[in-house]
Amino acid sequence: NIGALKALAKPGDAITAVSTADGGHISHARMGAVGLRDLNVSTYPWDEERMEPDIDASCKLIRDVQPKITLVGQSVFLFPTPLRELADAAHEVDSTVMYDGAHVLGLIAGGVFQDPLREGADVMTGSSHKTFPGPQGGFLLSSSEDETFHRRLNNAMFPGVCSSYHLHHVAGKVVALAEFEAFGQAYAGDIVRNAKAFASSLAAEGFDVLAESRGYTASHQVLTRHGEIDSGAGARAAKKLEDAGIITNMNMLPGDTKAMSPSGLRLGL
């Protein structure tokens, strides 16, 4: 992400993004890469029932702020983002649309989530080690045919933020790409089916699973609420599960304001 931000914006520029409390990645906040690049961030109004940016209000924000970068994508990513609508608003004000697909890249590649570069994103970033099952690393992708734009992206990565591409990782990524080409579609489909079944089973057992009206999830993630806002119930639940040998992620849910005492868990399948 820092490479893309370096390519697309200068210090002091405006950016819009999902807030950390609503599922945005820490790199999208002042505490992370956005702050390192010294960008001024405005966060999207959030639709808590649909667990996505409020489309009309977010489009208005984009038109009002006129950000250099319209950043979409989250680390809590239950459903495809309403990308076409946000991208249309962004392009009206000459804003570059950046899609952070780190957590859902394998689902995108498997054809079971959304297709960001065909839905309006100018740039997509992604991890090679999450739902895409390869060695640690990342991808920076664009469908633009503008060679000047390509050079900006390439130069931001090297010599901008990376000095080596780690050849041993390249070999591992080649194997992962070959395996994904052969088995990725079925693999991605199974991930989403398993997550949906898991969420439904938790709900049937009485757990408070978010986004019931939308079938809980369309990705590999499931969110559960374990107490009141800022109660720390999510942290306590994560500790109990860790003691039982199950590693989960305490997570802020909409309304939470304290990262270390959130009310929820993020579960990944």
Which sequence ranges carry the predicted segments?
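Broad gene-expression machinery/nucleic-acid interaction feature
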Residues: D38, G137, Q221, G264-R266
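Conserved PLP-enzyme active-site core in the AAT-like
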Residues: N1-E205
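Short helix/strand-bridging catalytic loops that position acidic/His residues to coordinate divalent metals
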Residues: V112, G268-L269
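Glycine-centered, phosphate/nucleic-acid-interacting loop/turn motifs that mediate DNA/RNA or nucleotide
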Residues: G245
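Hydrophobic, well-ordered secondary-structure elements that form the walls
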Residues: L241, L267
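Short hydrophobic/aromatic beta-strand micro-patches
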Residues: L141, L223-R225, G268
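Conserved small-domain helix->loop->beta segment predominantly found in fold-type I
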Residues: L177, A188, V192-A238, T248-S263
